[in-house]
Amino acid sequence: MKTFLTEQQIKVLVLRAKGLKQSEIARILKTTRANVSILEKRALEKIEKARNTLLLWEQINSKVSVSVKAGEDIFTIPDRLFKEADKAGVKVPYSTAEIIAFLVEHAPIEDRLAKRDFVIFLDSKNRLRISECLINFVEEGIGND
């Protein structure tokens, strides 16, 4: 199977998942603890990039999305999501209360306000998702040539 991880990175992650310390892994792999640390750090960075890439792909293929600006009251977001869904002819399978509960749990919210810009979207499997504003620059540039 193709992955972004090297064979050594996979070995380190497997052994760490089993609870081994970096020094123990270094002994098993006949390398230094510092090298194990670097392998683990780079593997985790690759995993984070892969997750972000998948989230971006899901956002690109989303049925409906709403950009939320820092400082915006989360109680305005469900109505905006429903309006965008109506424009797209999509039924949102969540109530206002469920959307607000999702935002409180998953979005960067403090005291009802967005702490930073983010996007809430309904993915192709009708799941609510939160993403950073990763594709706005592309959308803003469309038609401006």
Swiss-Prot record:
It comes from the Archaea. One of its GO terms (molecular function) is DNA-binding transcription factor activity. InterPro entries: RNA_pol_sigma70_r4 (IPR007630), Tfx_C (IPR029291), Tfx_DNA-bd_arc (IPR004645), Tfx_DNA-bd_euryarc (IPR018384), Tfx_DNA-bd_sf_arc (IPR036657). Keywords: DNA-binding, Transcription, Transcription regulation. Pfam families: Sigma70_r4 (PF04545), TFX_C (PF14601). GO terms for biological process: DNA-templated transcription initiation. Transmembrane segments: none annotated. Belongs to the Tfx family. HAMAP family: HTH_type_Tfx. Putative transcriptional regulator. NCBIfam families: PRK03975.1-2, PRK03975.1-4, tfx. This is Putative transcriptional regulatory protein PYRAB13000. It comes from Pyrococcus abyssi (strain GE5 / Orsay).
